[in-house]
């Protein structure tokens, strides 16, 4: 099944991750810690923890670092006592954006998120204003050059929801969020190491953007991701490879 290329999106994201490795690791550790605090330290009995660990491993976090985060969360460390909040809004060009946060101070967090939206030509919306446009899914992405037939055989046997082969040869494997970590483990065992893997909110319909608007939306997403309390940012913007190249 062919689709529009998402490889450009992944390359853009990976470049930012490489440049901000410390901040990314901080967010991943926070997710592992909270997952362990809420659901216990046994990943086999805690799907959220299992998914958090899978994402951390995909980002090359060491097993020792992961284990320390699990122990910290499962032990009820006071510093792990943060709450999860979600904000929704619109960016430039009417792009729908979801911002997931973990915070010990809601007032601080909402102020920072609102400021980022306002300064970037967007606006913070109400609960539910854009969430209906997205579906929670696991996405495991592979770079161009992966053996498509072999990957498809293993993935289908593992129970994936969908497999999308893009025009540039990159492949996205979609899973139910509850099956994400189990399927990723199967793929790794069979020798298929992904370029990116995460449980995310996938937009049902993508917003097509011109170069100027795409640049503004990217700037907003960057501002949001730079906030300490922000864990993840999702949008329905269609950042095509052509747009990425034009923006540079």
From Swiss-Prot:
Domain of life: Bacteria
GO cellular component term of the entry, any: cytosol
Molecular function per GO: DNA binding
Keyword set includes Cytoplasm: yes
Keyword field contains Transcription regulation: yes
Cell location: Cytoplasm
GO biological process: regulation of DNA-templated transcription
Main location: cytoplasm
Pfam families noted in UniProt: TACO1_YebC_N, Transcrip_reg
Keywords, alphabetical: Cytoplasm, DNA-binding, Transcription, Transcription regulation
Family as reported in the entry's similarity comment: Belongs to the TACO1 family.
Protein name (database record): Probable transcriptional regulatory protein FTM_1203
Organism: Francisella tularensis subsp. mediasiatica (strain FSC147)
Organism lineage: Bacteria, Pseudomonadati, Pseudomonadota, Gammaproteobacteria, Thiotrichales
